[in-house]
A protein has these predicted regions:
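Short coil-to-beta-strand transition motifs
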Residues: 15-24
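Basic/aromatic-rich interaction segments and small domains that mediate binding to polyanionic partners
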Residues: 2-5, 9-10, 25-96, 100, ...
Length: 109
């Protein structure tokens, strides 16, 4: 299995290519790192390959906010310039600058 370099970074605002939601990336897995049950719950005809980066998003749609786990092939940059209204954005990021969020720096112990 070849591990690819991630196309997106923590703080990037992205949107799903097929479903109507967007969000800010707060973590990246270099390959699929969720449960087999979760992966098998995706219809086979649209199931992404596991050997690509997967992203943890603070996501939103027109109705609610939530966290999402999305394959790289299903994401694209969101060029709207709008902030993400997820209530946990402030736990991970300080401010939005030039269309992306600046991660909080965490002191090392």
């Amino acid at each position: 299995m070849t591990i690819r370099t991630a196309k997106f970074s923590i703080g990037d605002i992205v949107k799903h290519r097929h479903y109507h939601f967007r969000g800010v990336i707060f973590d990246v897995d270099p390959i699929f790192s969720n449960t087999e049950e979760w992966w098998l719950s995706i219809p086979e005809e649209v199931r992404p390959s596991k050997d690509q980066p997967f992203y943890h998003l603070l996501a939103e749609n027109d109705e609610t906010t939530y966290t999402a786990y999305v394959s790289e092939q299903n994401l694209e940059h969101d060029g709207s310039g709008r902030p993400v209204s997820h209530p946990e954005v402030g736990e991970f990021f300080t401010e939005m600058e030039e269309g992306r969020y600046r991660p909080k720096s965490h002191p090392t112990h």
